[in-house]
Amino acid sequence: MILSLSHFLIVAAMLFTIGVAGIILNRKNIIVVLMSVELILLSVNINLVSFSSFFGDLTGQVFSLFVLTVAAAEAAIGLAILVAYYRNRGSIAVEDINMMKG
């Protein structure tokens, strides 16, 4: 069985929907929100690579590597901020983060 472009787009659309649902349904835990954002970025990367492969151009695949690099840096910085915030406040609830000064 040969996988066509529509197969990849369906998988990417499902991952995107799961990521958006994770953000909408779970707004209390910031770690779940960060994981949902990463899932959305993964679905965008799947779209970039699948369209790039379908049209025979390497630009989308190279751009996907840059997006993965930025996503990894974003996740590392976000988790470092959360660890520092948890050490100061003792909670990582989204409601508590809104009360920060600065």
Swiss-Prot record:
Intracellular or extracellular location(s): Cell inner membrane
Superkingdom of origin: Bacteria
EC numbers: 7.1.1.-
Free-text function comment from the UniProt entry: NDH-1 shuttles electrons from NADH, via FMN and iron-sulfur (Fe-S) centers, to quinones in the respiratory chain. The immediate electron acceptor for the enzyme in this species is believed to be ubiquinone. Couples the redox reaction to proton translocation (for every two electrons transferred, four hydrogen ions are translocated across the cytoplasmic membrane), and thus conserves the redox energy in a proton gradient.
Similarity annotation: Belongs to the complex I subunit 4L family.
Any GO BP: ATP synthesis coupled electron transport
Listed transmembrane segments: 5-25, 30-50, 62-82
One Pfam short name: Oxidored_q2
Organism: Methylocella silvestris (strain DSM 15510 / CIP 108128 / LMG 27833 / NCIMB 13906 / BL2)
Catalysed reaction equations from the record: a quinone + NADH + 5 H(+)(in) = a quinol + NAD(+) + 4 H(+)(out)
NCBIfam families linked to this entry: PRK05715.1-2, PRK05715.1-3, PRK05715.1-5
Protein known as: NADH-quinone oxidoreductase subunit K
PANTHER family: NADH DEHYDROGENASE SUBUNIT 4L-RELATED, NADH-UBIQUINONE OXIDOREDUCTASE SUBUNIT ND4L
Molecular function in Gene Ontology: NADH:ubiquinone reductase (non-electrogenic) activity; quinone binding
Upper lineage: Bacteria, Pseudomonadati, Pseudomonadota, Alphaproteobacteria, Hyphomicrobiales
InterPro entries: NADH_UbQ_OxRdtase_chain4L/K, NUOK/Mnh_C1-like
Chief site of localization: membrane
GO CC term, one of those recorded: NADH dehydrogenase complex
Enzyme class at the top of the EC tree: translocase
Bilayer disposition of the protein: Multi-pass membrane protein
